[in-house]
Every structure is written in C-alpha cells, then in structure tokens.
Amino acid sequence: MLTLDTLNTMLAVSEEGMVEEMILALLASPQLVIFFEKFPRLKNAVTADLPRWREALRSRLKDARVPPELTEEVMCYQQSQLLSTPQFIVQLPQILALLHRLHSPYAAQAKQLTESNSTFTPALHTLFLQRWRLSLVVQATTLNQQLLEEEREQLLSDVQERMTLSGQLEPTLAENDNAAGRLWDMSTGQLKRGDYQLIVKYGEFLAAQPELMQLAEQLGRSREAKSVPKKDAPMETFRTLVREPATVPEQVDGIQQGDDILRLLPPELAALGITELEYEFYRRLVEKQLLTYRLHGEAWREKVTERPVVHQDVDEQPRGPFIVCVDTSGSMGGFNEQCAKAFCLALMRVALADNRRCFIMLFSTDVVRYELSGPEGIEQAIRFLSQRFRGGTDIASCFRAIIERMQGREWFDADAVVISDFIAQRLPDDVVSKVGELQRLHQHRFHAVAMSAHGKPGIMRIFDHIWRFDTGMRSRLLRRWRR
C-alpha cells in the first residue's frame, strides 16, 4: 500500500510548511500561553522539546498509509500520464468509470470536460491531466492536514497532562531553569493526579520546615570553589619589609640570663662582694646564668622571596552524585519519617538544579533502592514517599551497600548521606576500615543527618560532617517560636 510520504513525493507536496504551521498553532493555544505566563521557567523546557515534536510529526506522516481508493486513483493517474492522446481517448471511458466508482472529487469535473467538448484535442488532454493532478494534490494536502490535526489534538492532550504535572511540582522541585528542564523531561510518565499529590504534600511540609530545607541546601552545596595555581606557573620575585631586632642596643627591654658584666643587675654585683658567695658568682658567670639587663632596638629590612605568578584557575570542587541512606526502623516513624522524606525531596531539588544524580537506599532488614534523578524520577519519588518506616535497624548493611555502590566508576566522586536517629549497634571494624579508606584515598565524604540528640557517638564518629536536626518536641517548639 502507498505511504503518505511516497504520495507527497510523487505530487511534490511539502509537509514541512504544514508541520511548522501546526507547531505555531499549538504554541499559540490559550492553554500554553497561560501556562507560560504562570511558570516562565518551564517555557524554555517546553521550547527545547520542539525538535522532538517536529521529528515525531514527520515520522507520523512518513509512516501513514494512504486510503486504498486514493492509492488506486493515483496509480491510474500515473499510468494515464504515459499514454498518448489517441491512447488516452481509448482509455477515457474506463478512467471516468474508475473515478465515479472511487467517488473521486474530480469525477464530476472530468465528466463535464469530456461532455462539453465534442473533439478531444491534445490541449484538452493536457488540461484534463493538470486538473486531475490538482485534485490529487488537494486530496493529499487534506489527508496531511487531517493527520496533523489528529496529532495536534493528541499532542495537546499530552502536553496539558505534562503541564499540569510540572506546574504542580515546579514550586517544590524546580529551583532554576536546569531543574525545570529536567522536571519537564521526567513528566512523560503516565501519572494520575492522586499519585503526584504525595510529592506536593511533602513539598508543603518542607515549606513549613524552612530549617530542614536550609540544612539540605547547606549539605548539598557544602563543597566550595577554590583557587589553585596553574601547573608549571613561572616564579616571580616578591619583596616585603620585615621588622626584626637590631644588634645596636637602644632601650631596656627586659631581663635575661647571660655573662655581660657591664649590664649586671645590682643584686648580682652585691653577691660578688660577699666572700661566701664569690665562687657561686664565678660559677654562674661561666655558665652564663647571671641576671642582666636586655637591651636591643628594632630595624626594618627587605625580604626577597619567590612565588608562582598570581594568575590562577578557579577549580570548583566536584559535585558528584548523592547516595542517600534512610533508616526505616520503627524509631524513625511519625514526625521523623516525615522529616526524612522531606529532606530527601530537598536533596532531589538540589540534584535537579545542579545536574547531579540522587540515589536513595532504604535500610532496615533489607535494602531498597530508588533513583530520583533518572527519567522515571517522579515515579521513583512517589514509590519512595509511599514507603512506611516500620522495620529494624541494620546500619552496617547500609554502609556495605554504600561501599559497594562507590566501587562503580560513575560514583567515584559521590557524597554519602545517612539519615537516621543513630540509635543502633556499633559498626563492625571492617566497615569502619573501608569507610576510612574511601575517605582517605578517594576523597569520598560521608554526611550524617541526625534526627535525634541521643545518637551513639561511636557510630557518628565515622562521618566527615554531622548535620543535626533534632525532632524532639522541645526543639520543634523552639524552631516554631523562632519563626
């Protein structure tokens, strides 16, 4: 069967103009205009999606099949082009019958042309074919427009669903244009309103706990940029004036031990006049232990040093992926559970803004994994937020899972974050040793987010940084009072 792409090529019908016209009409639709005004960050993300839309529309037109009736009419037209005028006159009754049987829009006009002219001349033959081709072009264009209109309705429906999802999650997850673009890319999944409302709920909880959001910002961006000299930088001479004691005495500055007879203190001279103390005086003189006045002055001199030239590169500390381990034991239930989930949502926000990965592991008796920054990040986040914290505590398994994950090449600069109340058994020596090796040799950093003031110091000593967010009633009331 004839494809629409082949038909367009045969009749020299250009679909590019129709595709561009449809895209412009879609962007000018009232739904998108209102959406762009409300969420300007997402406008760039939608605009960046236009090449994919164009390619999808071209692919749809290319693969579309032409109806059998139109295919048969086009084949008849092509065969008729090869006939001479006498041959065409012989075939004309069959051609008219075919057009009538196919209910061609050109059938009535073709019949009128033949009946209104008693003699079928070569000029009439050319006119017949030209008008027939024009009718076929109109039919092909109409077919293109029908398919594009169907695609426009489907595309508009999909875009509206994604706009609804992205618009709901934008205040929670989109911090900048980069995050808005990644959020738009993740909105392609089949999600219902009740699903993503869970993210909105925890986003509202996070907004009500600004200290928790601030803590996530500080942890996520705790690696500052630093300046380092360029490699093989030339040396330059650097001169400074330094002040140092001079050899010329100017004033009494204190008392010291020595053998300077001219600066002896009066008590030392008095000892020389006593016979019993005379030998003691000479002993102390030889050993330079006599008390004397200390006299000296000050002088300035030029100190010459060499250092690399001051031109420096700004070497930003690497911001690698997050590997977040969340304690799902029973002691982490209730308000602790809400805070832990909201904190992970805040880290997801930081990861989207900084183009980083965010990998979540839940540990109790088993380890469950979610990646919140992948193409299915929203679905993964919903599954994570739907979990309940009712297990036991096996923090050693958590660390072993982190260590195993960090062996991968794509995780060489990852930061580990452990969220727990740290009321657990001590870590095995092999785990402590391996964590120390990762910190020392590979510069991996381990962060602890302590949800309780009663965490065991022996466990928390292993971390590079400890971020405290006490969820006790007293601390919660104090935070509310300060706000």
Swiss-Prot record:
InterPro entries in the record: Uncharacterised_CoxE, Uncharacterised_ViaA, VWF_A, vWFA_dom_sf
Subcellular location: Cytoplasm
Gene Ontology annotations for the cellular component aspect, listed alphabetically: cytosol
Keywords tagged on the record: Chaperone, Cytoplasm
Principal cellular location given in the protein's record: cytoplasm
Matching Gene3D superfamilies: von Willebrand factor, type A domain
SMART domains documented for this protein: VWA
Family affiliation: Belongs to the ViaA family.
HAMAP family: ViaA
Role played: Component of the RavA-ViaA chaperone complex, which may act on the membrane to optimize the function of some of the respiratory chains. ViaA stimulates the ATPase activity of RavA.
Assembly behavior: Homodimer. Interacts with RavA.
Protein name: Regulatory protein ViaA
Originating species: Salmonella paratyphi C (strain RKS4594)
